[in-house]
């Protein structure tokens, strides 16, 4: 077992489960979906490359949940991380190499240069400083599930993306090392599906509010 992978799996799983249990629209249903997704992503570790970019434009339900600090995509990425790092901690032996040799389905986290990691960590550190400044300007940190844009948790909303990206970066490296062509193909399909979903949502929104071909009425998509 890799201790860092175990720790990341536990933290990601616990955080994702906590968000699911406090989800405003049916916490029991969301918790059940999280548990099912854990199993799916553990069984098919590259599935997230298709689903995350495909679902990203269409799973934001903030108008109905009232959440802006936390989003459905946060839960999805935390589930991906929990399953991926669990598989990395308890690797499954598979034959994926061209010569038939066996290797771990989830190898280590290497593959990115020290300079690249240093730059990423420096950017993450600068984000933490910015989040701290945001807390200070909002009158100090106070936690709340339904805070708005002028309250402390808005800094968390703005700063979390870099940390979610860094969280899944080793999983992307692992997928590319195992089956580079398949990983890139799944990601490409996911991006295309996400673009199609965003385009359809835009067409629906304009049709619903102004009319698809009405370019005279003031409206911001």
Residue ranges: model-predicted function:
Residues 1-2, 16-25, 41-45:
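Short, amphipathic, aromatic/basic-enriched membrane-interface segments that mark the entry/exit
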Residues 62-63, 127-152, 182-184, 196-221:
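Membrane-interfacial helix-loop-helix modules of multi-pass inner-membrane proteins that assemble, modify
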Residues 2-6, 22-34, 68-79, 150-163, ...:
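Alpha-helical transmembrane segments of polytopic membrane proteins
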Residues 39-159:
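N-terminal hydrophobic segments of proteins, predominantly signal-anchor/transmembrane helices
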Residues 48-49, 102, 107-123, 162, ...:
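Interfacial loop-to-transmembrane-helix boundary motif in multi-pass membrane proteins
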